[in-house]
Amino acid sequence: MEVNNMSKTRVYELAKELNISSKDLLSKLSDLDIKVKNHMSTLEDEEVELIKDLLAEKPKEEKQKDQKNHEQEAQDKEEKEIEEDSFYEDREEKRAYKKSFKKGGKKNKKLQKKFVSEESAKEDEIKIITIPEFLTVKELAEKMKVNPTEIIKKLIAQGIMVTVNQQIDFETASKIAEEYGFLVDKEEVKDELEAIFEDTPDREEDLKPRPPIVTVMGHVDHGKTSLLDAIRKTNVTMKEMGGITQHIGASVVEINDKKVVFLDTPGHEAFTAMRARGASVTDIVVLVVAADDGVMPQTIEAINHVKAANVPLIVAINKIDLPTANPDRVKTELSELGLVPEEWGGNTICVPVSAKKNIGIDDLLEMILLVAEMEDLKANPNKPARGTVIEAKLEKGKGPVATVIVQNGTLQVGDAVIAGTTYGKVRAMFDDKGRKIKKAGPSMPVEILGFSEVPEAGDKFVVVENEKKARELAEKRREVQRELELKKKQKVSLEDLFRQIQEGTVKELNVIIKADVQGSVEALRKSLEELSNEEVRIRVIHGAVGAITETDVMLASASNAIIIGFNVRPETNAKALAEKEKVEIKLYRIIYDAIEDVKAAMKGMLEPKYKEVELGRAEVRAVFKIPGVGNVAGCYVLNGKIARNADVRIVRDGIVIYEGKIASLKRFKDDVREVQQGFECGIGIEKFNDIKEGDIIEAYTMEEIPR
């Protein structure tokens, strides 16, 4: 069995031998009806021989093809000459016809007039005008060729008092135009800013291959940094060994005369934050999983982030040198998450590595190059640069410093750039080794000096004609941003889900589930996904056990999702971030309620009656046993206030363990109505004695929402 396997050849190996790309070979195999999944699939010896023979015969075929082409060209030339002769004959006939028409006198003129009037009548049947978002009454009158006074009369009849030079909006103008029998089209005015940031498609001949941009992700302590260090070490020459490499947030590695760019971003939080800002920089993600630990919560989060971004994934199973390493267990766990390894018949590339012992690093780099080849990454270096800011800071003696990735074109020293609401002129440029450079092509990470302010990570940058133009555009963007802040990007909420479905703005509802136990996560996931119908599909993009974190909120913001919490609470920072990002968090104690709410929202029957208003949070710092009363919690109010008539919930390690009412609220043995933030108090909970130090008491009231 083993001997047989040894004789098998992988697709990418054969491609290398034949000096063609894996992509071309795959298409040839498809034409020959040889079934292979991808470049890692194996081929039988007979299949390899067949392909080699066919490729050897190809030059002969091409020669015959050339001969046929010459014959075809000669035939086409003859046909063209015949066509030209007949064309000139037709033209002579036409001239003769026109002459006779002129000689025909009044009778023919009448016929001619009738013909013209019929044509114009046809044209009058459909009258279409194109108008912008706003225009004056005078401009509308000119477009429709009517008296402006008539339009003013019609507008006054509708209760709109205007003069001839006053502006009216598109809706009002289209109603007036319809009364005159016109069909109205809206004029698409392309904003100058939009036009500059919109990348025009390049011609195929201008595109050149570019290096892939790789992000390394994974759970804490699984060896992300060690792996990046190992990759760099295999690439550092003896000359560079003694020097200090400057950290700019990205590094360039050269393998077999090909470059690969690695982003040194702090894991999936930065990846998602940049995606939320609309920046798609990463071409390939390397997911690091420790062979001894296996799949961990952060690994699952990273997988969900990568799936949501639709980026190719390579799994690096690290720490295989440890005695406790179990790569097969890792592969099993990955398969359960839908990432089936190639050797098990799936599509996920898994490479066993040891960053510490430098094992399998070359294999991993080769796989990265293979995936990059399959992705066919190209860019046009011969145009003004555009790209994305990946890191930015204020440095002493340098001012605002930004690390950018050039995604298209070439960036040069002296170029005027705009990024987000900042602008500047590239005064100096440094590569990933800290060397001063004059220009940077596609996929290259560089540190640039010369911005007016510190741009934000994820901001897109583009080169413009001059600094004056860059300043004008940056000021315009600031104005646009102010307007956007006022009407913040609308996220999905259950209350307006039905309206959005009807308008056609929502075809898919993304949901993140957080619960107290894994069973609840699975139950909710199954129940919600079963609610999908033709109008809206419910997609659970992430489900996990534990409190709602900032990472969950960032994923929800990037994927326009809602968060459903079952028996869990959001962390303080997560709650603040959700308010800022306008992400909806729905909390439930009963699974049925969550399902019914989503179902009702989909049917447009959601009637909000009450909403929870958080009053304050207190931390239990001591527990006192009072005879005849039970346990009383000695608390410190962390934020807000605790009121005597409030409802409360007890939260332990992010999980709700009890809900009830306050039985007593004391301060220095005196009964009080409420205790403000920063003060200590004693709290007794109705019908609950299992209070412990470190518990959080959340006070809230239920407020009726007017309908």
UniProtKB/Swiss-Prot annotation:
Keyword Ribosomal protein attached: no
One Pfam family in the UniProt entry: EF-G_D2
Function: One of the essential components for the initiation of protein synthesis. Protects formylmethionyl-tRNA from spontaneous hydrolysis and promotes its binding to the 30S ribosomal subunits. Also involved in the hydrolysis of GTP during the formation of the 70S ribosomal complex.
Bias type Basic and acidic residues, positions: 55-80
Superkingdom to which the source organism belongs: Bacteria
Keywords from the named record: Cytoplasm, GTP-binding, Initiation factor, Nucleotide-binding, Protein biosynthesis
PROSITE patterns, sorted: G_TR_2, IF2
Region annotation (G1) ranges: 218-225
UniProt GO cellular component terms: cytosol
Domain tr-type G, first and last residues per copy: 209-378
Binding site for GTP: 218-225, 264-268, 318-321
Chain positions covered by the region annotation Disordered: 55-88
Chain's gene name: infB
Region (G2): 243-247
GO molecular function annotations of the record: GTP binding; GTPase activity; translation initiation factor activity
Annotated protein name in UniProt: Translation initiation factor IF-2
Residue segments, region G3: 264-267
Region of interest called G4, as start-end residue ranges on this chain: 318-321
Places the protein is found: Cytoplasm
InterPro entries (alphabetical): EF-G-like_DII, EFTu-like_2, IF2_II, IF2_N, P-loop_NTPase, Small_GTP-bd, T_Tr_GTP-bd_dom, TF_IF2_bacterial-like
Recorded family membership: Belongs to the TRAFAC class translation factor GTPase superfamily. Classic translation factor GTPase family. IF-2 subfamily.
Span list, region G5: 354-356
